[in-house]
């Protein structure tokens, strides 16, 4: 555990019934005259963009829509959108979407000038300076991008996803309106929900875990383990969906305070090269990596603590070993229940790509150094072999 730690978060978070209405007041309070609205075609097609659009209209401000962002975008695709954004003349940003949309908007908020671009931030994220206020509206209960200082982009030439991290990208305002996730397709709800699960359990068992991250990681883990199945299975389970939305936010706060570990590190090549959805790649690796990590005594102890906090039913586990094993089995059960693939074979990943995966995965030292149990290239090889 770190001896020094800090937590920075958005200026204000609005949740509950009709939370979207707060956008109107935010725009007026900031004196914004023109709003850049980031979204994507899928959000528009699902009818989800109408709510924030109406709230922006009610403010009387002009607005400009930027919706040409592909799924799992490369840094070049994000730069193209940022270049369009620069022509809008906007003085405030509103982003409505999943992690990719929110990350693109966060990057835009620090790229108003021509001093540097996304590629330069990949090499030197510290140069990013806050330029515009930003409002983030998540349409999934998973990524936590609405609260983190991170922006994840694909780097095709490295066949990797890379995180750009700078606290100047933390949102000013977050809107958690459960109406945005009510009709989320089960497949997407499942993948993003398990992404949030990975955030919480990785942050709780990482080297940088601290009282701030523990607070949010444990509460998020409790909410997810006891609500994710019903939230995904039942379109009308609004109480459970709302809890998942809050849990995803807590997971993002945990990332901000500590950070993810080997699950995310080893998943980045799966998205970067094979375009496997981020939540799915994390789900495939979640139980294998946590089982590997549980051989470290401190991780095993923390998994037992998580069991004591999150297991509300009359389970019979009494020892640390039993509790840690139960937690890992619970992770596997959730992934199975949600019908998420558990092997790379289902995505056509050939066995001969193994060494390339190992090489790429070991490059993500930003996250691997946070893993309590050190991960060697041989360890990574065995973990990838397990999911082949």
Q: Predicted regions span which residues?
A:
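N-terminal small/polar loop signature for handling phosphorylated ligands or for N-terminal nucleophile
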Residues: 44-116, 230-241
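Glycine-rich phosphate/pyrophosphate-binding beta-alpha loops
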Residues: 142, 249-282, 365-367
